[in-house]
């Protein structure tokens, strides 16, 4: 604050710019990160980008049973859902401090 209780707009704008740059950098890092999820004790693995794009799907031949296609489908869905949950957790951990947990010094309620 400036003398007389005035806010220093230049300082506030600089802080906002720094926060925006930090968020953009964190978003870029998250988008480039790949996360692996698994199901069936690791017999089915899904690798996704943190943005949600599936990159790879690995299925151990042990779980391929022509008589139990539904079981394999469940494992694939489970592996993808596990990877998505991990990606969401990663994003929350990296963006959490930048998104809403912080405050703007000198501004009440922020």
UniProtKB/Swiss-Prot annotation:
Keywords per UniProt: Cytoplasm, DNA-binding
Protein name per its UniProtKB record: Nucleoid-associated protein NFA_2940
Origin superkingdom: Bacteria
Protein's UniProt keywords contain Hydrolase: no
Keyword Hydrolase included in the entry's annotation: no
TM segment ranges: none
NCBIfam families registered for this protein in UniProt: DNA_YbaB_EbfC (TIGR00103)
Quaternary structure annotation from Swiss-Prot or TrEMBL: Homodimer.
InterPro entries: YbaB-like_sf, YbaB/EbfC
Annotated localization: Cytoplasm, Nucleoid
Predominant cellular place of this UniProt entry's protein: cytoplasm
SUPFAM superfamilies for the chain: YbaB-like
GO cellular component, one term: bacterial nucleoid
Family: Belongs to the YbaB/EbfC family.
Summary of the function given for this chain in its UniProt record: Binds to DNA and alters its conformation. May be involved in regulation of gene expression, nucleoid organization and DNA protection.
GO molecular function, one term: DNA binding
């Amino acid at each position: 604050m400036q003398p007389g209780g005035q806010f220093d707009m230049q300082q506030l704008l600089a802080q906002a710019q720094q926060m925006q740059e930090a968020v953009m950098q964190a978003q870029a890092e998250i988008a480039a990160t790949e996360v692996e999820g698994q199901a069936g004790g690791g017999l089915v693995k899904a690798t996704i980008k943190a943005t949600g794009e599936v990159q790879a799907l690995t299925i151990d031949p042990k779980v391929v049973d022509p008589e139990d296609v539904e079981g394999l489908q469940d494992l694939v869905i489970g592996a993808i859902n596990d990877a998505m949950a991990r990606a969401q957790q990663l994003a929350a951990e990296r963006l959490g401090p930048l998104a809403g947990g912080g405050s703007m010094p000198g501004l009440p309620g922020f």
